[in-house]
UniProtKB/Swiss-Prot annotation:
The modification Phosphoserine is found at residue 44. It comes from the Eukaryota. One of its GO terms (molecular function) is heme binding. One of its GO terms (cellular component) is blood microparticle. The modification N6-acetyllysine is found at residues 59, 82, 144. The modification S-nitrosocysteine is found at residue 93. The gene is HBB. This is Hemoglobin subunit beta. One of its GO terms (biological process) is hydrogen peroxide catabolic process. Red blood cells. The modification Phosphothreonine is found at residue 12.
Length: 146
């Protein structure tokens, strides 16, 4: 991902304020509600029958936190996202057979949740930087599919 020094600073500063459990749980929950076909990868999570069931599901929240922990690791390796996400790409491609388009969807949902969480602090330039990072992570996760 090619970010200016200013963009890297904005991403790092805002990310330092992110509650990974809350934001991750909400982002994954919203993904499962807004794009219900993504639920097929989470059969073991129990009740996903309604928006309130999804958003209150402890397994969704826990996995959302795990997703953001990985995203956080990626932020430490912006110059080598493909390397940082190689094992996760392999897992999602070879074992889980996740449609790589879902990574883009999750990245966009994450940006929505960050905007909702941080309000005015999530300025258009900050959003632009996060969109670049989310796209870079999605590309890195899709790498093993090619």
């Amino acid at each position: 991902v090619h970010l200016s020094g200013e963009e890297k600073g904005a991403v790092t500063a805002l990310w330092g304020k992110v509650n990974q459990e809350e934001v991750g749980g909400e982002a994954l929950g919203r993904l499962l509600v807004v794009y219900p076909w993504t639920q097929r990868f989470f059969d073991s999570f129990g009740d996903l029958s309604s928006a309130s069931a999804v958003m209150g599901n402890a397994k969704v929240k826990a996995h959302g936190k795990k997703v953001l922990n990985s995203f956080s690791d990626g932020l430490k390796n912006l110059d080598n996202l493909k390397g940082a996400f190689a094992k996760l790409s392999e897992l999602h491609c070879d074992k889980l057979h996740v449609d790589p388009e879902n990574f883009k969807l999750l990245g966009n949902v994450l940006v929505v949740v960050l905007a909702r969480t941080f309000g005015k602090e999530f300025t258009p330039p900050v959003q632009s930087a996060f969109q670049k990072v989310a796209a870079g992570v999605a590309t890195a996760l899709a790498h093993k599919y090619h």
